[in-house]
Amino acid sequence: TGRAIAPFVEAEWGPKAYAIMHRIKALFDPEGLLNPGVLLNPDDKIHVKNLKLMPLADEIVDLCIECGFCEPACPSHHMTLTPRQRIAVKRERERLRRTGEDPARLARLDHDFQYAGMDTCAACNLCSLRCPVGIETGTMIIGERANRRGATGHAVARFAADHRGTIENFMRGGVTLADAARAIIPAPAVEAITETARRLTNKRVPRVSRALHHGPGAPKPRDNRQDPRRTGFPVPIAQTGRPQIVYFPACPSRMFGAPKTEHGLLDTPQAMVTLLERAGFDVIVPEQLNGQCCGQPFLSKGFPEESKKVSAALNAELSELSDAGRLAIVTDASTCAKHLRELPGAIPVADSAQFLLAEVLPRLTIRQKLASVAVHHNCSAQRLAEQPATEALARACAESIAVLSSITCCGYAGDKGLFIPELNAHATRRVGNDIPANCELGVSTVSTCASGLTEHAGIPFVSLASLLEWASR
């Protein structure tokens, strides 16, 4: 079973059987090309020779034995590096740094690791679900991103954190402009222009594909008679007779809209409000919603302090609106829900899939169904173990469902689908094989993932809330 056991095979099986093994090996592999010295080896000290060095590199990954179980879960597998390979390169870089050996090799590894190890890492941490000891290689990469950030990067991040509303307006405006351009200029021409701009700016200009549409902004609940923050708590339930809920529309859902379909689906925020009201809830949405963010984008880019600042502002807002957690809080993006749940001292936030299944679907009447729906379990939904809830909601809206099995994380990873689109294209390269002929729509619980899947799957992907609203309309 390997070099560590090879010196003891004869002791285990005896000289006669051991000799037969050598004769069989000689017949099948006379040149000694297949695993030479791995299973059979005359050197009784081979198990203590040529040992792989595993220097301490990062406490997050130091337990890794490089077994490779993580590799199939990684969206950059067969593109750049896998989690195992990222760890191996990290260890080699640390060894070279400590020993001073071969500075030129270290410089090359440091330089090449930027793209192969960091830029093309989605930081989805699905590797941890496959790892026997739960190692989060993505967290290691986020830490390295933070270590590589300079004064200019932190200044830009601080500006973005302090002007979140302006940034959101700018991004939504950019996508709106691209939408308008496609209305008067052929889409291939628009994409050619953006690709030229990307080449001239070393990929600093985002790629805006035809699958990306401008978002709806803030939704409009039916009853906004009172600003909950004026008194510090929402309207008493006795005044309406309806249970109340705080709904936080995630920033991707506000900035990026759903693809147009023949079913007239609502964008995610308005679909969520409509569903919650249809199920009998009074919906409370933050009045000053523009710029509110869970902080995950800052953290994934390597700006933990700015992330904490942004997260704290949202947590304070949600705490006030929910009367310190007395009212349930729900958001529509699995990524945001997971991040908000992990904040120290944060109030509980439910993801849309679990809340819609438990609290909304039982109060609805399903009036129409699709023949088949494709289901994508995004990385945060997998880490939250939401697959059963997502599939149950999809089954409520369709006669059959097709769970995408050829992809794990779609590789869109926040804005990587805009700046490193090749990662999304690689991760979804086989998704068409998962979609039945009678399937005309797919669902996801993150709007950016839905955009990437729409581009590469051949059918539009929308939010679960949008589909459930249509089915119960």
Predicted regions and their residues:
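Conserved glycine-rich FAD pyrophosphate-binding loop
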Residues: T1-L63
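Iron-sulfur cluster-binding cysteine motifs and their immediate structural context
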Residues: G32-V38, F69-R93, T120-N147, H339, ...
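Glycine- and acidic
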Residues: G2-P7, E59, P75, G117, ...
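Cys/His-enriched microdomains
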Residues: E59-G68, P72, D119-A122, L126-L129, ...
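Iron-sulfur cluster-binding electron-transfer modules in prokaryotic oxidoreductases
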Residues: D29, G138-R473
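Non-heme iron-sulfur electron-transfer modules
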Residues: L40-I46, H77-F113, G134-A160, V462-E469
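Ferredoxin-like iron-sulfur electron-transfer modules
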Residues: I46-E66, G100-A123, H376
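Short beta-alpha connecting loops at secondary-structure transitions
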Residues: R3-E12, N50-E59, P75, T99-L106, ...
